[in-house]
């Protein structure tokens, strides 16, 4: 029987000092026999997805204590990728994932916590906490702050749903008036919550449902709706039950590595492909699998991408569908239900809220559930009132979207595409692979060939696109923006948005060793591995070189002879210490970022750190 970790600090004569300190936090004699649960919050006023979380940690804490545990809350950092976008602030986004994972490990291990409730929401926070939970392998439950409501704007007599990406594209489009830009800007992000499309934050919160570590609705019910409060309440009770099952009943099945096992990672990636999730999820799932010692790799993602269809299309892949609409269609359990009927997922895996995924779907899939409460839950709708307050409205749709032929979520027979929403491409330009969000690529450019236009930074690419240096038919190549070369592997949301605003969204491709925001769409191919800073062939591309992209056949080819590439490589390596570095940019790289660059690995491995372990 495993011993409660917390008893290291709460039991025994020699722990009198530690108990004295625990007492100073409010603990009483009776509390020293209870499990201590870490409530990992990520409240900050910098991020709309986290601005409403301040009191929610204490909501969970109260429920933990009512269920017989002791709750102790702490905070992690949280970076807003949208605010950090387009300047050197984006260098810090991906590295913050490692800091978040480390901070959770430090706090949980330093204080010997018995379990975790992870309150996350935005882009790197959910992945960082997921990595920590799998690294620590103590009972854990995830609950997110929830999606933002989509904005509504009336232009030219028509009302349309808008989001952050619409504001960015409109601002860069000279044909849109200043007044219209201002109207869109003021409407794009109306409430607290993670940005309203199937961007990285919402994608990851959806995937925690598929991994079995979060409660149904975690990824889809909007932050403002009263129904989301139930998730926080249930998380508090659920974690105490899981902790007792592990420490008192020796039930190791509840541990994160046994819940989020290889089959669960396959399920999560299958969901991601079916809903056209953010390409960043590939990076984060690989990193989480690494922490959980799960042998899940790019090869598995490639294999799954070849057999999973697109059953759901959400912004930015389509303009008028947001995560709130997915919730009305049955949420993530609705999509998983269709994948189950198609024989594409393994429902024998366990979850933190049901013995198996099959049991969970029996209750939560609206196409099979007999529960009126479940159907009512999935009718939770946006309130339509700007607010930063969680659980502030109780509006509901009159009816569910259960149409699997033409609705937001489709069945296999009526799939948007038989080919999946994400694909892994290989070739001499990406020997270890690269990622494209096929759900956001127009069918007319699934095969594309054109001359390269090379830039050594995102900033230079933006200047080139807006300055008219990029023309239709070209492949924009942005190099030295990978995990090590950036460092930090910046998101390229501005270049993709500006290609759209310049009328080149369907006329150009963009290829980079950096990554893309979940808000990016178009023929945007990222994560090229090996990256330029590691000596990858992408660092040998020259303006004018022909690049051929063939998504149906999963290939990306630099049409330059092996002999010429060898000459270029020899010339580069002759530079010695100055080799494989950007020469045409000035960038202030802090000590913190230099430390990250020294330890990080390629995108094909999730950009995890590689540290030589000392033998003790």
UniProtKB/Swiss-Prot annotation:
Residues found modified as N6-carboxylysine: 124
User: Where along the chain is the active site annotated?
Assistant: 517 (proton acceptor)
Q: List the disulfide bonds.
A: none
The superkingdom listed in its UniProt entry is Bacteria
Q: Where does Mg(2+) bind?
A: 81, 123-124, 491
Cofactor binding, per record: Binds 1 [2Fe-2S] cluster per subunit. This cluster acts as a Lewis acid cofactor.
Q: Which reaction does it catalyse?
A: (2R)-2,3-dihydroxy-3-methylbutanoate = 3-methyl-2-oxobutanoate + H2O; (2R,3R)-2,3-dihydroxy-3-methylpentanoate = (S)-3-methyl-2-oxopentanoate + H2O
Which pathway is recorded for this entry?
Amino-acid biosynthesis; L-isoleucine biosynthesis; L-isoleucine from 2-oxobutanoate: step 3/4; Amino-acid biosynthesis; L-valine biosynthesis; L-valine from pyruvate: step 3/4
What this chain does, per the record? Answer: Functions in the biosynthesis of branched-chain amino acids. Catalyzes the dehydration of (2R,3R)-2,3-dihydroxy-3-methylpentanoate (2,3-dihydroxy-3-methylvalerate) into 2-oxo-3-methylpentanoate (2-oxo-3-methylvalerate) and of (2R)-2,3-dihydroxy-3-methylbutanoate (2,3-dihydroxyisovalerate) into 2-oxo-3-methylbutanoate (2-oxoisovalerate), the penultimate precursor to L-isoleucine and L-valine, respectively.
Cite the record's note on assembly.
Answer: Homodimer.
Provide the family line: Belongs to the IlvD/Edd family.
- Its protein name is Dihydroxy-acid dehydratase 1
- Source species, please? Bradyrhizobium diazoefficiens (strain JCM 10833 / BCRC 13528 / IAM 13628 / NBRC 14792 / USDA 110)
Encoding gene, per UniProt annotation = ilvD1
